[in-house]
A protein has these predicted regions:
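Terminal targeting signals and extreme-terminal segments of soluble enzymes
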Residues: 1-76, 82-140
């Protein structure tokens, strides 16, 4: 089951062509990523980073820029999990505007790390279960 989140394209995201500058779209996706942890796993990303010392840095990205994100657009993100490995998680992102137009699609692989050593570690069981509940095609 996918998580759906929304944000607006604001002025600091724009480039000289008056559309979202592509690195800002990755920043937006990361904001959605951080926000998705609470509905998916019941824990906030700051809690994981600061208290549990667990992080999920991106190690692989495949992205299609389909249409521009424009100033004032409301971006609706649909985020689902494609795969949960021993220490990796594959995320699937789809960003649509307020008209339902698909603007951006990305698959991103993250790896669970200990934030002190930055060494890979297995995804903790409580997080694994939450992520598995949001596998693509799984309905609740």
């Amino acid at each position: 089951m996918a998580v759906e989140l929304s944000r607006r394209v604001d002025y600091p995201m724009l480039d000289g062509a008056n559309i979202a500058y592509y690195p800002r779209i990755f920043d937006l996706a990361h904001r959605f990523f951080e926000e998705a942890w609470e509905p998916m796993c019941g824990v906030s990303y700051p809690e994981m980073i600061n208290n549990r010392k667990i992080g999920f840095p991106v190690v692989h990205v495949k992205t299609d820029f389909i249409a521009p994100l424009r100033y004032g657009d409301t971006i609706h993100a649909t985020i689902a999990i494609e795969r949960v490995g021993t220490s990796s998680v594959t995320w699937n992102y789809r960003l649509h505007n307020q008209d339902g137009t698909l603007l951006w699609a990305s698959t991103q692989v993250t790896v669970c790390v200990d934030m002190d050593s930055l060494e890979s570690q297995p995804v903790p069981d409580d997080l694994r279960q939450g992520l598995l509940n949001h596998l693509m095609g799984v309905e609740q």
